[in-house]
Amino acid sequence: MSGHRFQALEYEPAFLSLGEQYWDKVQAATFPQHILRFRNDALLPLMGLDPAEVTDADFIAAFGQFQGREPFLAMRYHGYQFGEYNPHLGDGRGFLYGQFRGVDGQLYDLGTKGSGTTPYSRGGDGRLTLKGGVREVLASELLHRLGVRTFRSLSLVETGESLWRGDEPSPTRSSVLVRLGRSHIRFGTFERLHYLRRPDLIQRLLDHVIAYYYPHLLEIPDPKERNCAFYRELVARTADLAAQWLVAGFCHGVLNTDNMAITGESFDYGPYAFLERYDLGFTAASFDYYGRYAYGNQPAICAWNLEKLQIPLSWVIPLEEMAAALKTFGDRCQTTYLKLMLKRLGWADLPLELGRSLVVETQAFLSRSLISYPQFFISLRQEFSPEWAADVGHLFSGSPTLTPADQKLLEAWKRCYFERLQQATPPQRVAIPQTLRAANPLVIVTRPHIEQIWQAIDQEDDWSRFRATLELMQV
């Protein structure tokens, strides 16, 4: 086998070293074709690689042909799926490709999706549709641009197979996606060990998680207090993540406990959707018949999942300590939401007591009007001017697309925003355009837009819309 640049990384067998109770060694599938459709050069410096020196052939050799990297690990886990416990889970169409230290000193995972069957494929083909890969690239990169903690997409390789799926026109094209994130360890990784009644393995896994992903907690000498501090921080990270999703207008779709990362990152959001309109009851998954994972219910579900995680962790952390920590979830999520929503509105340092009314007014306008959720923030970024502070009539004066009813609803919002501008100092007003640019990309990735991108790829093999969308995210 010929070498490739990704073999030069110093891979660290952190998860492998936990022992075979946590994983199965697997092999990658062999594919008839390898076409690199996406490479994320922005991630290569983190890996200590120079994008100019990494060729497309390097990506294909590493993440299409899987040369020179073994063993690959299918991770074992269980999970609560739509509220019901399922002990028949695990990596079914991907594996842990390898772990490495970034130039920042932190441990990162490379994981695949669509790379072949594993012991947990449950009758599936272990493949990922090309459309599914395109969707995940778009989601992960937009989430990152919006400031949401998420796994990133490193590469997407089309693999030349025809796949049959019940939820999209078939046959359809195949792909392998490679993701980069802190850890694939899930809430469900712990839940499986409780199911097996192995508190020793739970403690070993928790020690591993703290050492690699919460290393600052190692300064706490008492192991019991260290474990408690871990759960408290996980609650805070998860509350922040739920708030980030709400502000981004993102609906994960399937927030089962096996899709919750122990590091507080977004991943495994297959049927996701970004809001078209602000609707707390919106559900992304067609099979979510009762709206369990609705957009507005995501904080409550995250808290529910954290509560379920208390069951396996109760072997090593007192329940009363975890219950007390979980009570802080709501306030933490709400505070983070207010701060982040104010940034989307242009206010980086507005005190919450002054900004709360503006956020409430924004929610009221967006929920009652027909305006697009992402377009509202794009318009705010494009139209804002410091001159708005001179006259309320200047606000959104260039928005002829609003209906008369929506224009009336907007008046209350404009008065509230104008009041904030009147109270702001000149430096605060000058900083608003920069804050708006940082918080609001000029791109929309709702389902109709994704469908347009996919139709061009599927019918004409035209990737220009896909590439243009990714480029626009950086503006």
Curated annotation (Swiss-Prot):
<feature type="binding site">
    <location>
        <position position="90"/>
    </location>
    <ligand>
        <name>ATP</name>
    </ligand>
</feature>
<feature type="binding site">
    <location>
        <position position="92"/>
    </location>
    <ligand>
        <name>ATP</name>
    </ligand>
</feature>
<protein>
    <recommendedName>
        <fullName>Protein nucleotidyltransferase YdiU</fullName>
        <ecNumber>2.7.7.-</ecNumber>
        <ecNumber>2.7.7.108</ecNumber>
    </recommendedName>
</protein>
<feature type="binding site">
    <location>
        <position position="179"/>
    </location>
    <ligand>
        <name>ATP</name>
    </ligand>
</feature>
<keyword id="KW-0067">ATP-binding</keyword>
<feature type="binding site">
    <location>
        <position position="113"/>
    </location>
    <ligand>
        <name>ATP</name>
    </ligand>
</feature>
<dbReference type="GO" id="GO:0000287">
    <property type="term" value="F:magnesium ion binding"/>
</dbReference>
<dbReference type="Pfam" id="PF02696">
    <property type="entry name" value="SelO"/>
</dbReference>
<feature type="binding site">
    <location>
        <position position="126"/>
    </location>
    <ligand>
        <name>ATP</name>
    </ligand>
</feature>
<feature type="binding site">
    <location>
        <position position="268"/>
    </location>
    <ligand>
        <name>ATP</name>
    </ligand>
</feature>
<dbReference type="GO" id="GO:0070733">
    <property type="term" value="F:AMPylase activity"/>
</dbReference>
<feature type="binding site">
    <location>
        <position position="125"/>
    </location>
    <ligand>
        <name>ATP</name>
    </ligand>
</feature>
<keyword id="KW-0464">Manganese</keyword>
<feature type="binding site">
    <location>
        <position position="268"/>
    </location>
    <ligand>
        <name>Mg(2+)</name>
    </ligand>
</feature>
<dbReference type="InterPro" id="IPR003846">
    <property type="entry name" value="SelO"/>
</dbReference>
<feature type="binding site">
    <location>
        <position position="93"/>
    </location>
    <ligand>
        <name>ATP</name>
    </ligand>
</feature>
<dbReference type="GO" id="GO:0005524">
    <property type="term" value="F:ATP binding"/>
</dbReference>
<comment type="function">
    <text>Nucleotidyltransferase involved in the post-translational modification of proteins. It can catalyze the addition of adenosine monophosphate (AMP) or uridine monophosphate (UMP) to a protein, resulting in modifications known as AMPylation and UMPylation.</text>
</comment>
<comment type="similarity">
    <text>Belongs to the SELO family.</text>
</comment>
<keyword id="KW-0548">Nucleotidyltransferase</keyword>
<keyword id="KW-0460">Magnesium</keyword>
<keyword id="KW-0808">Transferase</keyword>
<keyword id="KW-0479">Metal-binding</keyword>
<keyword id="KW-0547">Nucleotide-binding</keyword>
<feature type="binding site">
    <location>
        <position position="259"/>
    </location>
    <ligand>
        <name>Mg(2+)</name>
    </ligand>
</feature>
<feature type="binding site">
    <location>
        <position position="186"/>
    </location>
    <ligand>
        <name>ATP</name>
    </ligand>
</feature>
<feature type="active site" description="Proton acceptor">
    <location>
        <position position="258"/>
    </location>
</feature>
